[in-house]
Amino acid sequence: MSERRLLLVHAHPDDETLTTGGTIARYAADGADVHVLTCTLGEEGEVIGEEWAQLVADAADQLGGFRIGELTSALSCLGAGRPRFLLGAGHFRDSGMAGTASAADPRAFVNADRDSLTAAIVAVIRELRPHVVVTYDPDGGYGHPDHIQVHTVTTAAVEAAGSAQYPDCGEPWEVAKLYWTVTEASALESGICRIGDIPDGWRLPEPGELPSVPDADVTTVIDVRAVLDAKREALSAHATQVTVAPSGTEYALSNDIAQPILAEEHFVLVRGAAGERDADGRERDLFGGIGH
């Protein structure tokens, strides 16, 4: 095992790249053991373009399987190995947005028993023994039910993994640090202001339309400039979900809203002691302060 081990718990394929792709690539390139745990196949996602449009849930319902391939390619671009799905690929179904028919599906991730989900993540933590775990904030970044569920059960699992709870899930392992992945408001605004020409059909975001958190909430900033090419390639690998602009500095989801590809990724430390801080009072290393 590497002396630095990182586990990122995400809801759907592409989530790992959108907010943490640079961090994954940076630590993988630095020799850390980086694992991505994905909880659903993203079956309820919309699809960009006509080529794969009939894969959606209301037609062939084959999008989830297709997205396994996209995730596999994206993780390869980031240097993070093969995908890992909670309790196996397809065990839980993408819930879609709150109030939709998909959210009422008994197999939807949002309807799964939370204690069982917590136990499953505890088992992964005890197997992989990560020093650092990354997941979403309580709002799941933008309110998606699966993201909120991931936040809830991952937080519970990190707390339980080092205890005597869930004795059938392996030997206890204490996670040193837990982070939320977020986007700093001022960095997002600066990135939007730098957007130049965008592809036909795209538009700039309205003020406050893209999720972000106040600058004061951010505890940790990871410089990902050296691995932006890997992040761009990983974004492009999720071709049913993401389009990277020809400039390489913006991308859009199926809503055609231009979003900047930022040179830094942002986190909030919510468990464990902070490491060395810079002049702005922020960590620059997820593993800072951890004795190996």
Curated annotation (Swiss-Prot):
A Pfam family reported for this protein in Swiss-Prot or TrEMBL: PIG-L
Function: Catalyzes the deacetylation of 1D-myo-inositol 2-acetamido-2-deoxy-alpha-D-glucopyranoside (GlcNAc-Ins) in the mycothiol biosynthesis pathway.
NCBIfam families for the chain: mycothiol_MshB
Keyword Ubl conjugation: no
PANTHER family hit by this protein: 1D-MYO-INOSITOL 2-ACETAMIDO-2-DEOXY-ALPHA-D-GLUCOPYRANOSIDE DEACETYLASE, N-ACETYLGLUCOSAMINYL-PHOSPHATIDYLINOSITOL DE-N-ACETYLASE-RELATED
Catalytic activity reported: 1D-myo-inositol 2-acetamido-2-deoxy-alpha-D-glucopyranoside + H2O = 1D-myo-inositol 2-amino-2-deoxy-alpha-D-glucopyranoside + acetate
Protein's GO biological process: mycothiol biosynthetic process
Residues the record lists as binding Zn(2+): H12, D15, H147
Enzyme Commission designation: 3.5.1.103
UniProt name for this protein: 1D-myo-inositol 2-acetamido-2-deoxy-alpha-D-glucopyranoside deacetylase
Cofactor dependency: Zn(2+)
Cofactor: binding comment: Binds 1 zinc ion per subunit.
GO molecular function, one term: N-acetylglucosaminylinositol deacetylase activity
